[in-house]
């Protein structure tokens, strides 16, 4: 699963996801892509599940690019712990995704196979997405 090798700070603020994505919203590498339509935190496990689903469906041939990276640590407090005594310890990593962001790109396969593979990857995502074609 994806996670940063090292970070400047162990814990982040939660932040908020307002507006649309101005970066990473055009197809750069492949011919087909999966684009987010809603804001969300996408975990490294979800990213990996989508990538695996696409790879399995594309079989031989075809190249896949993952355009998001989980660089935000999410902390979780132990269960049945009283309030106070600081923030919890980092548990997993998420990518902050805003509407318009490209999640995956794909090329080297026919459109019908790409549609099928990307549809399966989309079902692994916690948000509504759309299939787009470059050009």
Swiss-Prot record:
Its main location: plastid. Pfam families: Ribosomal_L16. GO terms for cellular component: chloroplast; mitochondrial large ribosomal subunit. The keyword Transferase does not apply. GO terms for biological process: mitochondrial translation. InterPro entries: Ribosomal_uL16, Ribosomal_uL16_bact-type, Ribosomal_uL16_CS, Ribosomal_uL16_dom, Ribosomal_uL16_sf. GO terms for molecular function: rRNA binding; structural constituent of ribosome. Gene3D superfamilies: Ribosomal protein L10e/L16. Signal peptide: none annotated. Keywords: Chloroplast, Plastid, Ribonucleoprotein, Ribosomal protein. It is found in: Plastid, Chloroplast. Belongs to the universal ribosomal protein uL16 family. Part of the 50S ribosomal subunit. This is Large ribosomal subunit protein uL16c. It comes from Morus indica (Mulberry). The lineage of its organism: Eukaryota, Viridiplantae, Streptophyta, Embryophyta, Tracheophyta.
């Amino acid at each position: 699963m994806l996670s940063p090798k090292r970070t400047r700070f162990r814990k982040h603020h939660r932040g908020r996801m307002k507006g649309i994505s101005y970066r990473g919203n055009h197809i750069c590498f492949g011919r087909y892509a999966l684009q987010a339509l809603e804001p969300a935190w996408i975990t490294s496990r979800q990213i990996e599940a989508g990538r695996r689903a696409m790879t399995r469906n594309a079989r031989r041939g075809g190249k896949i690019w993952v355009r998001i990276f989980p660089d935000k640590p999410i902390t979780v407090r132990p269960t049945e712990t009283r309030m106070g005594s600081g923030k919890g310890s980092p548990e997993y990593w998420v990518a902050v995704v805003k509407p318009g962001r490209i999640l995956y790109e794909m090329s080297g396969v026919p459109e019908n196979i790409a549609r099928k593979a990307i549809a399966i990857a989309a079902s692994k995502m916690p948000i509504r997405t759309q299939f787009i074609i470059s050009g």
